[in-house]
């Protein structure tokens, strides 16, 4: 029955996407769009080879050697991206052993949401995904490559790279991760320190010491937020070397896995990206998201990725998959363990093995790990090891090594996935329930309406919020201010919840993938900038957030006939004006052209 249900969901998406998918494939494989170094003029070719070693110029210029692009998101500001500094040299060296070469075709921007969290720079975050996609396309537009490597890990970077890569879906492509940092202080201790600071129990110096014990090394943050959810999705889509996501950057195995990615692409056996990414692989990513309790941000990113290859995914599909897929993992913020502990007790190989065994994952997809004898997701049920300096794969563990972190399908943490879609007279919203205790999943309380995140924080500081309430924060959607994450609210709302108050958040903005314990109806659509119902809410309105029953409503008789709250009239009138400072004015056109959260919050208008 589950397999039948999964097939039904897939068929609905296939039918819905028939015209757009056909058009995407037609454009992608149009002969006019294929790599054409052989037909370039001699001056053009000379520009291609000018910076290359002398002995490679003629072989590459005459296409006697394969030439691959490297699109890198390397910088020193992101702990997860600093390891990419040396990856191009590792890739080039390995390719030389296979009569091939690679060029760094483009560097793309990569910002750290952990740095900008709660500040104005966060308003660039979502649209940085689109800038990364555009930058990726610019790098590949020389149109002289036989394939491409994509080096990226963090929140907006992987979705942006993949959206850009799909515009060159005729190229064989491999995504290369850097892995998580080694474990520092436990994530729950970090969260407690933040709450203690918010309540005035510890000082700034004490908090900084704790934070630096948590974020202390190269690699991704160790909680299961958007960055690590990205890595999971790349595995489930078959774009990583198998089970390379959660190997630490300085583990000797990491270097060998990077080299293996080069071997795979040089082999010529990796299919074009457009043939790897289809309805099944996208659904596999969504299944992985639900089974592991991944980030809410992918209710935006996965839709945007799908649209970039002609597949029309929507929140109803998320809801259907959530109702079908059990929750198999408890990784912070859904539990106390981090991704290193998750990897140690079985990791993604075990999750994939369990889902395949129960018919809850599409096995017959193409991946970069396909061989003549074995194709599909079975290749991702194996774990990499180093033996005598050689990469070997062994079957995943037969049972979880810690059932507090990872469980089989027969004994899940919950029968349903980690995300739900809420519906009601406010519109549609997303909620992550995997980290919310049962007693907090339903809240009925009076609204307190805020104009800004900073107003909330100030009123909390002044002890004005110590009561039951639903915080309402509109004009945080894509068209309003770029849809920043509002993770700073989590600490304060969590502190109030721990004091015994019934609290919740309703917003058209986003939360971090690290957010969790407080019930939050986010990505509310339509957003305030599109005259969504959220801007009709007034202080004192009774709101019910009922996650178990997928409901979100204002319980006031006059609500649906009511006009806009006068508090927001000025905000609504000024939406088309640029917001100056920190480069935000440069993003005005992206903001004004953005589509809805349920359409992926994209700014370059891919129409479906």
Curated annotation (Swiss-Prot):
GO cellular component: cytosol
Record's keyword annotation contains Iron-sulfur: yes
Pathway: Carbohydrate metabolism; Entner-Doudoroff pathway
Keywords from the UniProt entry: 4Fe-4S, Carbohydrate metabolism, Gluconate utilization, Iron, Iron-sulfur, Lyase, Metal-binding
InterPro entries reported for this sequence: 6-phosphgluc_deHydtase, Dihydro-acid_dehy_C, DiOHA_6PGluconate_deHydtase_CS, ILV_EDD_C, ILV_EDD_N, IlvD/EDD_N
Family, per entry: Belongs to the IlvD/Edd family.
Its job: Catalyzes the dehydration of 6-phospho-D-gluconate to 2-dehydro-3-deoxy-6-phospho-D-gluconate.
Name of this chain's protein: Phosphogluconate dehydratase
Organism: Helicobacter pylori (strain J99 / ATCC 700824)
